[in-house]
Amino acid sequence: MAIRNLRFLGDELLRKKSRRVEKIDDRIQALLDDMLDTMYENNGVGLAAPQVGILKRVVVIDIGEGPLFLINPEIIEQEGSYIEQEGCLSVPGRQGEVERPYRVKVKAQNRDGKEIIVEGEEFLAKALCHEIDHLNGVLFVDKIIDVKGE
C-alpha cells in the first residue's frame, strides 16, 4: 500500500471520462488499497481513481462507517434534492454549495467482483454523486451554486 500523488484542478486528466474495469486483478486491488490510504492521509471522505491519475471507474468512500470500494459504479435511482457545502481533495481551499439528490441508489461491483447495491441519503448520497462525477470528468466546481474560499 502506498500514498499516491493527487491531481489538482487544471490537470486535464480530471476532465476525461474514465474507462470501465473489465477485470478485477491484483493491480485493481492495489489501486483500491492505495486510494484508501491516500484518502485517509489527506483527510478525505471519498476518492476517485482519476484523482490519482488513473482513468478507471474506481471509487473509495468512507463517511465514518467503514470503507466502501466501488468498481464501475452507476446511479440507478435518485430522488429529492439536497443542497450542502462541498469541497474536494483535487480543489484545495475551495468550497461551495452544490445541489445533489437527497437519496441515491448505486449499482457497482465490490472488490471481489460481486454486484452490490448501495443506497445513501444526504451525506452518503452526496459523496456517491461527487465521486461518480469524477469518473465522468465533472468536478464539484462545475455545479457550485454559491462559492466559498479562494
Curated annotation (Swiss-Prot):
GO terms for biological process: co-translational protein modification; translation. Belongs to the polypeptide deformylase family. Removes the formyl group from the N-terminal Met of newly synthesized proteins. Requires at least a dipeptide for an efficient rate of reaction. N-terminal L-methionine is a prerequisite for activity but the enzyme has broad specificity at other positions. This is Peptide deformylase. Its EC number is 3.5.1.88. It comes from the Bacteria. Keywords: Hydrolase, Iron, Metal-binding, Protein biosynthesis. Binds 1 Fe(2+) ion. Its cofactor is Fe(2+). SUPFAM superfamilies: Peptide deformylase (SSF56420). It catalyses: N-terminal N-formyl-L-methionyl-[peptide] + H2O = N-terminal L-methionyl-[peptide] + formate. The active site is at E131. InterPro entries: Peptide_deformylase (IPR023635), Peptide_deformylase_sf (IPR036821). Fe cation binds at C88, H130, H134. GO terms for molecular function: metal ion binding; peptide deformylase activity. Disulfide bonds: none annotated.
